[in-house]
Structure formats: C-alpha cells, structure tokens
Amino acid sequence: MSASAASQAAQRQVRVQLTSKQEDIALPEDTGPILIPTGLRRYALSTLVNNLLGNEKPIPFEFLINGAFLRTSIDEYLTANGISAETTLEIEYVRALIPPLHIASFEHDDWVSSVDVLSATSPAASWASASVPQGQERILSGSYDGFLRVWNMSSQVVATSPAATEGGHTASIKAAKFVSPNSIVSAGLDRTVRLWKYSESDDGFSGTIAPQLELYGHKLDINSLAVHAPSNRILSASSDHMVGFWSTKKSDAPAAPENLLPSAASRSSKRRKLNSSVSTPQRGPLALMSGHTAPVSAAIFDANDSTVGYSTSWDHSLRTWDLVTSSLVDTRTTSHSLLALAHLPDHHLLAAGTSARHITLIDPRVSAATIAAMTLRGHTNAVVSLARDPHSNYGLISGSHDGTCRIWDIRATKTDKDGVVGESVYSITRKSLEEEGKSASKRVGGEGVKVFGVCWDAAVGIVSAGEDKRIQINRGEGVLSST
C-alpha cells in the first residue's frame, strides 16, 4: 500500500462489532458497534480490545472476519473481498496463537516412516484407563531399517524390537502404533501385521518389545494401520488393493493362509530363508475387503463408530466400509490420488492428503451434495500424513514430501472460483536443515527431508518423522484457538 493510500485508509472509518466465543475474554453483551479507522491491523486491534477489556497485562489477540484470520489492514481486507466500508463488520477475536517451536530431535540410523505417542491423553492410554505420569511419556518409531524403537522424553532408546532372526520384521516398517501401554502393532514391506508385547524395567530405563502374534493375509506392502483397542480390532491399507481387518486377540483370529506363510515362500523359491529362533503364533485376517483398483494408502476407523471404516487409495477414491459385514457402503471419487486420511467428526468431514499437494475435506455422508467441502492449499509436494489437533476441533496437522508439516485451522478459509479454500496457519520445517545452514527452499521437492509420518499429542506435542532419519518434536499446545 502506498503512503497516500495508507493515509486515506487511516482516515476512513468502518463500524465493527467485536465478539469472542471465549467467555473469559468476551466484552460485555451491551458493547455495541464502534467506529474504527480502516487502516488498523492486528496489533492495533489487539491494543483496542485490551483497552476495552481494561486489561492491566495485555493479551495478544488474533482476529477473524467471516471465518478467515485477518492478515492485512481492515481496508485491504474490505477491498480484497469487495465489502463496503458502510457495512457493520463483525470481527471475532481469539487469543493469539503460539508458534510450534522446536523442542527436540531424536536421531536414527535410517529413514523414519512412522511415529506414535503413549501419554496420559493418547488413545492407547485412554482406552486402557492407564495413567502415564508427566515426563514418563513414550514415543514409538518405525524405521526403514526394520526396527521398532521406544524412546523416552530424554531422547534415549528404552527398547528396540528384535532382528528378523529373532522374530522381528524382515523388511522396512511403514506403520507402527501403540495398542495399549503394553501392546504395539506394526506393519510394512514384509506384508505382515505384527503384534508385540511391550514391557519396561522398574526404573523405566530399559524395556523389551517381544513378538506376540504375526498376521498374514496381504500379498504386497502394507502402507498404514489404524487401531481400535476397545473392540480388539486393526485396519490395514495395502498395495495389494485390499483393506485388511484383523483381531488383536489370537483366540479370535482365523488360521493364517498357508500359501502366505514364510514356510510356503521358502519352499516355492530359492531365496534365503531367515530362520527365526522364535516361534510366534501366526493367524489370518477377519476379512480382506476389496473394491479399490489401486494401492490403498490409508485406512481408519470412524472416530465415533468403530463399526465403520474409511479408506483412501491411489485410485482417487475414498471408500466407506461396514466393518460388521465387511462390505463396501459408499465410494467418493476425487480428481487425484489420495495418500493420507484423518477424521474430523465434529464437522462430519474426512481430510484426505493428495498427490496434487493439497488436502481435500470430504463429507462422507450419503446426503452430502458435493464431494469436496473444502480444499487446503500450501504444500509443494504430496501430502502423505495427517493428524487431528487434540486441543481444537478445528485443527489439523499434515506431513508432506516437501519437507514440512503444516498446521491448518479450517475456520481460516476464503471462497474463490474453486470453492472454499484454506491456507495453513504455520509451516514447520525440519530442524536438520537449519543445522546444515540450509533453507527448505533449497531442497527441490523436499529432497532428503521428506516427512513420512506425523502425530499430534496433547501432552508431548507435534511429533514428526522423515527422510532426515529423525523424529522431530514441536510445541503443539496453544497453536490454535480451542474455541
């Protein structure tokens, strides 16, 4: 904006109604509209609200107009959106966001594909009604070297899964999750889903990850897992176009398909057999659900109904499954390959990461008139991992092959020719780039720093994993307004 234009904007005024959904910072109900200069920006508006509230210690505020965060002057906003200054503008204010600052990084010997957290607020602990004292949280990582590792918050490895000859994975791990504080599930390129018993010494400095159950059924790589411990169920997404449905209990699971067992593979080929000195029970799937026509990238349980599942695929589709009958209920077809999936139940939306660098928010309900309810843009490479904000119903974190994680507030949107579009609130880069003195922009498409997995935990924060062979932890609390 030129100096003369800024001067004119400062002289123009607009009537605004300031509101907040947070009761402790709301203005009295009888506070009517007030006239303010259209040249004001966030800082000046924040000062104004603090003065109206009579705060001795100023609170930094952010401002939303029609659901979008104000990032310009009011005058520029009015001009960009074709709104007359004669209009009474309703402006909502919330506490200012806290940047997701880097807390720690844990280094591995190989790429890290997957991360999960065990904390007092994590699903695994909540399902088991288990308490995890502050500071005793654990981070689980799955790596391309074929090993699972459990870490404490001091970046020490508490336990490592056994080698292939001792009952471990025989190829790279792509997915790993805590089922409970003493149970872990993992899967990967060896086509198996494996359950492990996790235990720690009394002092918490050492532990064991012991093979408990091997599940066979998929014929190609397994790309992701979802767990619902209360029903003892697991979902898997595989490159064989199938969605696997499994039991965590040996007694509930059917026999493993003979033709997929390692013994059959060693008989039918001349390749070296990895003889395991550990005899682990082997079982098969409750169901393998067909329908996708390309590799399945993700499968999840409905957050409110564990008898419903969703899956995404390279075939561009999102599919809904009835897990009671293992049948396909609905198919939503998009324009791009879908690579990641997360449920936002309060908004009846599913977030799907795409190969086209954006996130599509889809309403899976049959009554939904349009497939894409919203599009989130900002990544410069494929979006391969998604997780909900545990602090806010509106928040989402994404991990991308562009080497960043982006935080989204689905209230921060605008409408353009392509419909409702959102931009990220924050972008988290890899700390490893900073240490090398390089910027993310110098890595074409995220080369060397691709993010493969992300988890957002209320106690620990934003935990991401990637091609830089690191787990990275960033602050996750207060990043978005919780209203």
UniProtKB/Swiss-Prot annotation:
Keyword annotations for this protein, in alphabetical order, are: Nucleus, Repeat, Ribosome biogenesis, rRNA processing, WD repeat
Q: Does the keyword Repeat apply?
A: yes
Q: Name one GO biological process term.
A: maturation of LSU-rRNA from tricistronic rRNA transcript (SSU-rRNA, 5.8S rRNA, LSU-rRNA)
One Gene Ontology CC term in the entry: preribosome, large subunit precursor
| Region Disordered: start-end pairs | 251-288
Q: Where are the WD repeats?
A: 117-161, 168-206, 217-256, 291-331, 333-372, 378-418, 446-483
Gene Ontology molecular-function annotations: ribonucleoprotein complex binding
- Spell out the family assignment given in the record's similarity comment: Belongs to the WD repeat WDR12/YTM1 family.
Q: How does it associate, per the subunit comment?
A: Component of the NOP7 complex, composed of erb1, nop7 and ytm1. The complex is held together by erb1, which interacts with nop7 via its N-terminal domain and with ytm1 via a high-affinity interaction between the seven-bladed beta-propeller domains of the 2 proteins. The NOP7 complex associates with the 66S pre-ribosome. Interacts (via UBL domain) with mdn1 (via VWFA/MIDAS domain).
What is the designated name of this protein?
Ribosome biogenesis protein ytm1
